Amino acid sequence: MIKGENNIKLIIKKKIINLEYMFYECKSLKNIKELKYLDTKDITNFSDMFYGCSSLSDIKGVENWNVSNVNNFSFMFNGCSSLSNIKGLENWNVSNGNNFKYMFSYCSSLSDIKGLENWNVSNGNDFSDMFNGCPSLSDIKGLGNWNVSNGNNFSYMFNGCSSLSDIKGLENWNVSNGNNFSYMFNGCSSLSNIKGLEKWNVSNGNNFGNMFNGCPSLLDLRGLENWNVSNGKDFSFFYNGCLSLLDIKGLGNWNVSNGNNFSYMFNGCLSLSDIKGLENWNVSNGNNFSYMFNGCSSLSDIKGLENWNVSNGNNFSYMFNGCSSLSDIKGLENWNVSNGNDFSYMFKGCLSLLDLRGLEKWNLSNGNDFGDILNGCSSLSNIKGLERRNVSNGNDFSDIIYRGLSLLDLKGLQKWNLSEQQ
């Protein structure tokens, strides 16, 4: 390994089979022209080779490298923040490569991936973080011919690609072996539609957490209607921060019966006015519903949740926090929340909520945190619906009705069972 050197003169006296970390963090290295004479035919590992070479702007010199025996390309150009194009790689035979994770991650100037069009990545199984942190990348059409059928990990692949406005090039990808799609398009703030994903077979996927988190330009979910997510367990943060998302009808056919984590799923979806499409969801295995609709300030109607089986849910904190347009919650009347222990902030900031009809039958006996549950519900005039409750396990009742400015009638609270409170 040559670490942090400014001027490099490479003299090779014997056969090399491993170039791992060779120029690790050589931050002043600007070009690698002299490497054109390097005999790479026996090399098997290129991982971290140019890791952190932040001044490297030109990769001329590697065009004719024989990389046919290399299996590990992970982190190879990670952190090469001055690298704007990779045209010199078009003739590389990467057919033996199985590990491509972080290969071009944090190449913040990379705007063009011409050179990768004809790569044979058919043996690749790990593509995680491959283009993570490439905010200048606006076009991935060059990946259209990639055979990723052996890939199992696609997590963070395009994470932070904030200039990516469409996903043309991925339409025909065979991702049927993929199990991890978490954070795949996280932070793609210019992405406005995902229609090209309708053919994806994600039936083996179990982790979808944060997949489209932080995609504020995404308008609808057309393209996902027929996704088979039946093996999915983690749906947390899936559409978190999708500020422009108007419609989630495309999720109506999703089988989420194995899902256990739905936290933050639609958190911060400011434009979402209804949740039609979720009415047939089987969430019976879900245990975490915290922040699910937090900050959905346009949500005025929760029709679609009436028949949800939330009997395994233990965390409902912040679930509807900040839903300032929500005026009634009648649709929750049949919810079995008997396993719930955290109800804190659940309806905080629901400024338009007029009454609590829908909560009359709720069994809160296992709840221990009720802090701020109705804080800021300034249109609430009474708390009918919460009478005669056994909340003896509760340890936090702080600010339950703080800033409930219109709350005139507190009758019912005197019938709460607080017998174990000190």
Region annotations inferred by a language model:
Residues M1-Q422:
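Negatively charged
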